[in-house]
Amino acid sequence: MFCRFSGCNLWNGREHGRKDAICRFCDTDFVGTDGDGGGVFASADILVDAVAATWQGASHPRAARFVVCTGGEPLLQLDAPLVEGLHAAGFEVAVETNGTRSTVPGLDWVCVSPKGGTDLAITSGNELKLVIPQDGVDPARFESLGFDRLWLQPMDGPDVEQNTALAVRYCLENPQWRLSIQTHKHIGIR
C-alpha cells in the first residue's frame, strides 16, 4: 500500500514552477488529493487508523501488512511517532525518498531515488532507484554507496521507449544494476 505525502523540497508540484525546479520530471500529483478531508490528518494516530482501514489484505499468515511512504518527499513530514504507530498497527514501513533529508528511526526499508543537482543525506539503505536519463547524472557515481540493490528506471514521458532501451542496455553492460519499471502504470493502477 502507498501512503502519499504532499509537498517536496525539489519542486512545488505546480506546472508553473516546473521550469525553475531542481526536479523537473516528476510524474506524481502530490499537491492535490481526493482522500477524505483532503488528505489532511490531525495526528499520527488518525493517519495510522486511516491506513489500517484502507488495508485490504487478507489475514493469511504470509500476507504482510506493508506500507510505502512516498510523495512528494515523505521525509518532510514522516516522523518517529507515525512509524511507531504503523508498527503498532502491524505494518512494515518503507520510505521512498529523494535522499536529501535524513531518515527517521525505525524504518524497515529505505529506497533512495536521487535527483540530479542534489546532495544525498542518505548514502546507504536497501535500494537506490535512479531514474534515467537525467542531465549530468552518471549511474556509476552511486555504485560505491552503501545500498543493497541498484535499480535503473526509465524516465516516463514522450521518450519512454528510448529511455527504456537506454536502461536495458545499461543494465546488460553493468549487471550490478537491475531494471525497474513502473508496473502500476502498465497495468492501470492509480
Regions found by a protein language model. Give the residues of each.
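Conserved AdoMet/S-adenosylmethionine-binding subsite of the radical SAM
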Residues: 61-66, 74-190
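Conserved beta-strand segments that form the floor/walls of ligand-binding pockets within enzyme
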Residues: 2-4, 25, 68, 111, ...
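Conserved Radical SAM active-site core
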Residues: 10-107
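Flexible, acidic/Gly-rich N-terminal and inter-domain linker regions that tether
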Residues: 1-32, 173, 178, 182, ...
